[in-house]
Amino acid sequence: YWSLGDKGHYVKTKEGKTFHMPNSGAIFRCELDGTKVDRYSSGERNAQELAFDSFGNLFSMDNDGDYPGEKERALYITEGSEHGWRLNWQWLRKQDFTKISGISAYNPWMEEKLFLPDRDDFAAYITPTIGNFGPGPCGFTNNPGTALSKDLADCFFMTNQQNQIRVFKFLPKGASFKFEELKPIKGGIGNTGLAIGPDGALYSASWGSGKGFIFRFDTESEKDHHPARSETQKRLGLSSKEQTIETLALWLDSPDQRVRMKAQFELVRLGDL
């Protein structure tokens, strides 16, 4: 799965499909060999990174258009979902008519408050955000299950322009989700990408001040580590091709998403799943 920004796209696949949206971002996906390219969702503005929870639900944190009063959006992304943003709405305030007449052009995004969560009079043609936040999301990743500490096992992490790493939980709400924000982690300078290492620590890429950095974040003490963290690191270092079917089946019950996926992919390769 990967995201495209709102400058639009025109994609023709080898299977004969055409995906064309000149003024919208989108989420695409394909098989590992590059076949079966498919547009999974549309209407994102700048959803830079994607992350799945332990049940396969897909989320992203989308940047806003920098209008006064507008806010960034937390997105729950489902197959075929349309999230509403169009590139041309970015420039309505800069059009010649607006500049010459002094009369603001009608902007559905702001006038109809399409960036806010669902409500009684919300437009029915788009999938609304599950919550607002700000400002400047960039890196975004999930805890695969055993990283850091047990109380952060089902959390998501996001970098922003305030040099923080913000912490979120996505909680079921009807057929969708809501999000809850926890205490942020203080980051470095200009944090961008995020990744969970096989050692269970959280890593952040940083830029600025003429130098690049990699920051590592972890619990204050090893006694606070998730109890399955060391076992997860051990399993991640093993070759799945050298494991028995029984061992791979055991891995499917791991509390860590990476171990489960490792076992699943190998069992599929062997034709046993």
What is the predicted role of each segment?
Residues P255-D256, D272:
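Short inter-helical turns and helix N-cap capping residues of alpha-solenoid HEAT/ARM repeat scaffolds
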Residues Y1-T247, K262, E266-R269:
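Beta-propeller domains with acidic blade repeats across secreted/periplasmic ectodomains
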Residues L252-D253, V268:
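Alpha-solenoid HEAT/Armadillo repeat architecture
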